[in-house]
């Protein structure tokens, strides 16, 4: 994966990092404080001033995300999409692979 733009996300708030962190703390109940550099999704790392609030609501993860040259946003991402993308990537990888039995001509 590795790129936030490949995900279908919703921008809940735009502002400075402190304002985004405060927005999450005020608007969500299930919050876990994380360290900067934590890999929240495959290839996607948290950037900011620790502790960084990451919220979980229903089947969504809400966290502040900083894009260089664009600023900081509070993003809301559906976990079903992450799982769907992983399954599609695995299918693409496995497409060209054949099992041992299929490679044996006499089997």
UniProtKB/Swiss-Prot annotation:
List where Basic and acidic residues composition bias occurs.
Answer: 88-97
Stretches the record annotates as Disordered: 88-107
Q: Where is the composition biased (Basic residues)?
A: 98-107
| Name of the protein in question | Uncharacterized protein MJ0453
Q: Could you tell me which InterPro entries the record lists for this protein?
A: MTH0776-like (IPR012031)
Checking Pfam families in the record gives: DUF1894
Q: Domain of life here?
A: Archaea
């Amino acid at each position: 994966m590795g790129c936030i733009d490949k995900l279908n996300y919703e921008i809940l708030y735009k502002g400075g990092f402190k304002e985004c962190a405060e927005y999450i703390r005020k608007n969500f109940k299930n919050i876990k404080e994380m360290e900067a550099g934590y890999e929240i999704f495959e290839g996607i790392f948290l950037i900011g001033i620790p502790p960084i609030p990451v919220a979980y609501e229903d089947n969504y993860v809400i966290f502040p995300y900083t894009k260089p040259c664009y600023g900081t946003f509070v993003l809301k991402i559906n976990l079903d999409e992450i799982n769907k993308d992983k399954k599609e990537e695995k299918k693409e990888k496995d497409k060209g692979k054949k099992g041992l039995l299929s490679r044996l001509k006499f089997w």
